[in-house]
């Protein structure tokens, strides 16, 4: 049994399908679900729309969970990428989801980070780089990583950060360069 946030997103659906192929039961957390996920008996869909993360524990079946994959992140492209309110909310959600991971008895969280973490870190150490809106997203990812790792440690959860960079494929609908170039 595993839990996946952002399960209905571009990367989330691919991960869920790979997990299902390996025989896992998936608890999918997202704001909406397509029919493929919603109609699969191996998937338990839990809507997070208009809910506090602390309310979700009672909706997650009491099972032994091997891993909690945190993919959910608003504002990965477009104007929301530079919206500090959106990105700060993402940081809080990441920490709240890690606490939820511990609350449901899962001892391992995989946190989906971004290459923008490294770019932001370089920006913070340099006097030669002008700030841009994308650094708000990167700073959010970096903050979520650092705070999330701490929250995980304080709650007895193994924290595994993974960097996802320039991924594209079937189902992607972002405003990022590769997707928009392919569609032109």
Name what the model sees in each region.
Residues 5, 29, 68-74, 109-115, ...:
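SDR active-site strand-loop-helix element
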Residues 136, 140-143:
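Active-site helix of classical SDR
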Residues 146-184:
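NAD(P)-dependent short-chain dehydrogenase/reductase
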Residues 2-22:
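N-terminal Rossmann NAD(P)H-binding glycine-rich loop of SDR-like oxidoreductase domains
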Residues 50-89:
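NAD(P)H-binding glycine-rich loop region in Rossmannoid oxidoreductase-like domains
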Residues 24-35:
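Conserved glycine-rich Rossmann-like NAD(P)H-binding loop of the short-chain dehydrogenase/reductase
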Residues 40-53:
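Rossmann-fold cofactor-recognition segment
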Residues 68-70, 95-136:
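Conserved Rossmann-fold NAD(P)-dependent oxidoreductase catalytic core, especially the SDR/UDP-sugar
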């Amino acid at each position: 049994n595993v839990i996946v946030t952002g399960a209905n997103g571009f990367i989330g659906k691919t991960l869920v399908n790979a997990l299902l192929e390996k025989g896992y039961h998936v608890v999918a957390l997202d704001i909406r679900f397509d029919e493929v996920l919603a109609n699969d008996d191996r998937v338990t869909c839990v809507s997070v729309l208009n809910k506090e993360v602390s309310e979700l524990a009672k909706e997650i079946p009491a099972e032994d969970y091997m891993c909690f994959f945190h993919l959910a992140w608003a504002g990965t492209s477009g104007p929301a990428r530079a919206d500090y309110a959106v990105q700060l909310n993402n940081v809080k959600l990441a920490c709240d989801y890690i606490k939820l991971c511990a609350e449901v008895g899962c001892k391992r969280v995989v946190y989906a980070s971004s290459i923008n973490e490294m770019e932001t870190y370089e920006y913070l150490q340099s006097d030669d780089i002008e700030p841009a809106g994308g650094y708000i997203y990167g700073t959010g990812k970096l903050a979520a990583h650092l705070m999330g790792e701490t929250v995980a440690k304080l709650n007895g959860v193994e924290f595994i950060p993974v960097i996802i960079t320039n991924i594209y494929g079937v189902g992607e609908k972002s405003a990022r360069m590769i997707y928009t170039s392919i569609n032109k």
